[in-house]
From Swiss-Prot:
A GO molecular function held by the record: RNA polymerase II cis-regulatory region sequence-specific DNA binding
Domain of life: Eukaryota
DNA-binding region extent: 54-122
Underlying gene: SRY
Function: Transcriptional regulator that controls a genetic switch in male development. It is necessary and sufficient for initiating male sex determination by directing the development of supporting cell precursors (pre-Sertoli cells) as Sertoli rather than granulosa cells. Involved in different aspects of gene regulation including promoter activation or repression. Binds to the DNA consensus sequence 5'-[AT]AACAA[AT]-3'. SRY HMG box recognizes DNA by partial intercalation in the minor groove and promotes DNA bending. Also involved in pre-mRNA splicing.
Keywords, alphabetical: Acetylation, Activator, Calmodulin-binding, Cytoplasm, Differentiation, DNA-binding, Nucleus, Repressor, Sexual differentiation, Transcription, Transcription regulation
Family: Belongs to the SRY family.
Keyword Hydrolase: no
Name of the molecule in the record: Sex-determining region Y protein
Subcellular location(s) per record: Nucleus speckle; Cytoplasm; Nucleus
Species: Elaphurus davidianus (Pere David's deer)
One Gene Ontology term from the biological process aspect of the record: male sex determination
UniProt subunit comment: Interacts with CALM, EP300, HDAC3, KPNB1, ZNF208 isoform KRAB-O, PARP1, SLC9A3R2 and WT1. The interaction with EP300 modulates its DNA-binding activity. The interaction with KPNB1 is sensitive to dissociation by Ran in the GTP-bound form. Interaction with PARP1 impaired its DNA-binding activity.
């Protein structure tokens, strides 16, 4: 029994020998996904892979808030970054022009150094949406399209339900109309049958009174005679 179980267990090398094409496709897809994830984590851009990203020169507020942010973060370790930024903006507005002057001078000095180092620099903001789309390989883009189509299937299913509901309502309406017509037909037939039956009874009574002369010799309390027919 143990020998049979051991024979059923296949090693990765045997699987690769049996189906090398499928194994190669799976491995290539796995490596492509890993490379795409690595690019997303490191923030590398395909367009700027061969060029170093040049940062903008710091302004007076950035020069002041760089040290102040560290102090606030150390004093309030549980405070979020967004709250720290709000507090720094409020404090910067409360500073006077004399208190802001040294930071403006430092920002002017950094701007001059940046111009000397990068004479033809132009600020070009990155577009995050296009950058994320370019980072995706061909296989992952196809997978995203397939996932997008699968997410749209519930809406198609709802449309199908609406169509089936409409067809059911139309069938029920036609069925109710046919039932109404059938009921009216049976009512007319029933009324005509009762009318014919009453007419036949009157004709039968007239024939009986004409055919039997002893009808007049009945007792004075009786106005009619009943016969089984």
């Amino acid at each position: 029994m143990f020998r049979v179980l051991n024979d059923d267990v296949y090693s990765p090398a045997e699987i690769q020998q049996q189906n090398p094409l499928a194994f190669g496709k799976a491995s290539s897809l796995f490596t492509d996904n890993r490379s795409a994830n690595d690019q997303c984590e490191t923030g590398e851009n395909v367009r700027e892979s061969g060029q170093d990203h040049v940062k903008r020169p710091m302004n007076a507020f950035i020069v002041w808030s760089r040290e102040r942010r560290r102090k606030v973060a150390l004093e309030n370790p549980k405070m979020q970054n967004s709250e720290i930024s709000k507090q720094l903006g409020y404090e910067w507005k409360r500073l006077t022009d004399a208190e802001k002057r040294p930071f403006f001078e430092e920002a002017q000095r950094l701007l001059a150094v940046h111009r000397d180092k990068y004479p033809g620099y132009k600020y070009r903001p990155r577009r995050k949406t296009k950058r994320q789309q370019k980072l995706l390989p061909a296989d992952s883009s196809k997978l995203c399209k397939q996932m997008h189509i699968e997410t749209l299937q519930p809406f198609t299913y709802r449309d199908g339900c609406a169509n089936t509901t409409g067809s059911r309502m139309e069938s029920q309406l036609s069925l109710s109309q046919s039932v109404t017509i059938t009921n009216s037909f049976f009512q007319n037939e029933h009324h005509s049958s009762w009318t014919n039956l009453g007419h036949n009874r009157v004709t039968l009574a007239t024939q009986i009174s004409a055919d039997f002369p002893f009808y007049q010799s009945l007792q004075p309390g009786l106005s009619c005679a009943y016969f089984q027919y």
